[in-house]
Swiss-Prot record:
Presence of keyword Ribonucleoprotein: no
Protein species of origin: Vibrio atlanticus (strain LGP32)
Key words, A-Z: Antiport, Cell inner membrane, Cell membrane, Ion transport, Membrane, Sodium, Sodium transport, Transmembrane, Transmembrane helix, Transport
High-level lineage: Bacteria, Pseudomonadati, Pseudomonadota, Gammaproteobacteria, Vibrionales
Signal peptide: none
Transmembrane intervals: 13-33, 98-118, 123-145, 149-166, 205-225, 238-258, 308-328, 330-350, 356-376, 393-413, 451-471, 480-500
Chief localization: membrane
Name by which UniProt lists this protein: Na(+)/H(+) antiporter NhaB
Catalyses which reaction(s): 2 Na(+)(in) + 3 H(+)(out) = 2 Na(+)(out) + 3 H(+)(in)
Membrane topology reported for the UniProt record: Multi-pass membrane protein
Gene: nhaB
Free-text function comment from the UniProt entry: Na(+)/H(+) antiporter that extrudes sodium in exchange for external protons.
UniProt keyword Acyltransferase, yes or no: no
Coiled coil ranges: none
UniProt GO molecular function: sodium:proton antiporter activity
Compartmental location: Cell inner membrane
Length: 530
């Protein structure tokens, strides 16, 4: 029986997404205006946040850009926020958008070097525990100087490379032939178990690396975008920022690494999968074949990419330009000196990042609603009016942590530092208390936010990447795998805030490592973004 036009419209709406999912999105779109106009705009704002989180959680059913975008368009249309506010959020977050467009594409042109290095690491370290710790520490070290998104882009690029090599051979093809690694139809039953184990192995390495970016990112002022905002507000330089964070970040780092080793040893929370022997054999053969077939031109490419990698790390660590612009320089240098000059060859590099860039723009529309409807105001006001200084530090950390799990952690950090800055200007708190609160805000936004992909842009990027469905990494699985880290990082961080930060900071003052700041302040900034 031929399909009616009405049915065709319904069939086309959100494509292959399940019918219940389509129904859920339609119901959200019907309910939201009623709640906004007839119940309470504040309630409608929180409802929108929950609905947006739902679209992220269902990322494997339907990419969140379409359903999330429809919700955001409606929110602007009914007046929950204004187009100008969304544009302002995008302006404030231009560095992040540039980072995604250019840096992720730049990493694409360095994948030969990355695959070369990581193949050596993967095949050289036999112990899964040591390998996991190596990934976690490497990601932490890189994230202290580079942006976490850049580090995750590197790891994703490497993982896709490893996955496609094995998938190609398991489908009965050679390592050099063309192959679509998104389809499993050609995989035989014998190799299917290996494939599942390999997926679990890659999932665990990616999650260790993801958490590593949080462990390293919290330590320095260039590690995460909100750190930069907080450092600017407090007037701290690179070295002072590291020292002030140490009472919290050092114990958290060591406990994070210990957690990495323990979850692997006891094979809990989805960790512990070993690299299957058949897969190792295929990767060894691939490595040998690559080495045997490497021409002088290939070697020259590796040298060029190594030089560009040095420029990338130095440029980012010294902050010689905005991250996105350094990414653009990487694209130009890498393509010019490795001979990639056709437009269609360059286009592939942008495929990974642009859908996520669009999704992030939608995310900032939701952040605009959070600001306009003052959704976090009750929490912030309650914490600021606590009299006991020690309790206030702990509460700031906890409140930041909880809000960072559901919202953009840069937004949360920026809102809090502005409120604290205002309190300092009005004489509600002393400058020393302001400095301690800045530490609580920075660690509170960075550490507990590993709980969900909403909190960490790097996790969100991983969840919505082309790699996530290949290795079966869903929102729920990500939350479960992050759980041991969430508990350890959040609690050790809290212990650092409660027990270590005040006495250690006093000791740093006495030792002359840092100086007592006077009341000088920078004008409060408006929301920033990832």
């Amino acid at each position: 029986m031929p399909m009616s036009l009405g049915n065709a419209f319904i069939k086309n709406f959100l494509g292959k997404a399940p019918d219940w999912y389509k129904l859920a999105i339609i119901s959200f779109l019907i309910i939201n205006p009623f709640v906004f106009f007839l119940v309470d705009p504040f309630v409608a704002g929180w409802l929108l946040v929950v609905e947006f989180i739902f679209t992220l959680a269902m990322a494997l059913k339907c990419y969140p850009l379409q359903p999330g975008g429809l919700l955001a368009i409606q929110a602007v249309a009914i007046g929950m926020t204004k187009p100008e506010m969304v544009y302002h959020e995008l302006q404030a977050n231009l560095p992040v958008l540039l980072l995604l467009v250019f840096m992720v594409a730049g990493i694409y042109f360095m994948k030969e070097l990355l695959l070369f290095i990581f193949t050596k690491i993967l095949l050289g370290i036999q112990s899964k525990i040591l390998l996991s710790v190596a990934f976690c520490v490497a990601a932490a070290f890189l994230s202290a100087f580079l942006d976490a998104l850049t580090v995750i882009a590197v790891v994703i690029s490497v993982a896709v490379g490893f996955y496609s090599i094995y998938h190609k051979v398991a489908s009965g093809k050679g390592t050099t032939s063309a192959h679509d690694h998104t389809h499993d139809e050609e995989i035989s039953e014998l190799t299917r178990d290996d494939l599942e184990n390999y997926r679990a192995f890659l999932r665990s390495l990616l999650m260790h690396a993801g958490v590593g970016t949080a462990l390293g990112g919290v330590m320095t002022m260039v590690g995460e975008p909100q750190n930069l905002v907080i450092a600017k507000q407090a007037g701290w330089e690179f070295g002072e920022f590291i020292i002030r964070m140490l009472p919290v970040t050092l114990p958290v780092f060591f406990c994070g690494i210990l957690t990495c080793a323990l979850v692997e040893k006891f094979k809990v929370f989805g960790y512990g999968a070993e690299l299957p022997n058949n897969v190792r054999q295929i990767l060894v053969e691939f490595d040998n074949k690559e080495r045997a077939n490497r021409t002088k031109q290939d070697v020259a490419k590796l040298w060029v990419q190594s030089a560009i990698a040095v420029w990338l790390i130095v440029g980012l660590a010294l902050h010689v330009a905005e991250v996105g612009l350094i990414g653009l320089s990487v694209i130009i240098l890498a393509t010019a000196f490795t001979g990639v000059i056709e437009e269609h060859s360059m286009g592939k590099a942008f495929e990974e990042a642009l859908p996520f860039t669009a999704l992030l723009a939608v995310f900032f529309a939701v952040v605009a609603v959070i600001i306009d409807q003052a959704l976090f105001k009750p929490v912030i006001d309650a914490v600021l009016h606590v009299e006991d200084k020690g309790a206030q530090l702990a509460l700031f950390y906890v409140a930041n942590g909880i809000l960072s799990m559901v919202s953009d952690n840069v937004f949360v950090g920026t809102v809090y530092i502005n409120e604290v800055k205002t309190a300092l200007v009005e004489g509600v708190i002393t400058r020393d208390q302001f400095d301690l609160l800045a530490v609580a805000i920075n660690t509170g936004t960075n550490l507990p936010s590993v709980a969900t992909p909403n909190g960490q842009a790097a996790f969100l990027f991983l969840l919505t990447s082309a790699l996530a469905p290949l290795i079966r990494l869903s929102y729920g699985r990500m939350v479960i795998m992050a759980l041991p880290y969430t508990i350890v990082l959040a609690l050790v961080g809290l212990a650092g805030i409660v027990f270590f930060v005040e006495p250690m900071t006093a000791w740093f003052y006495d030792a002359g490592w840092i100086i007592h700041r006077t009341g000088e302040v920078v004008a409060p900034v408006i929301s920033g973004g990832h």
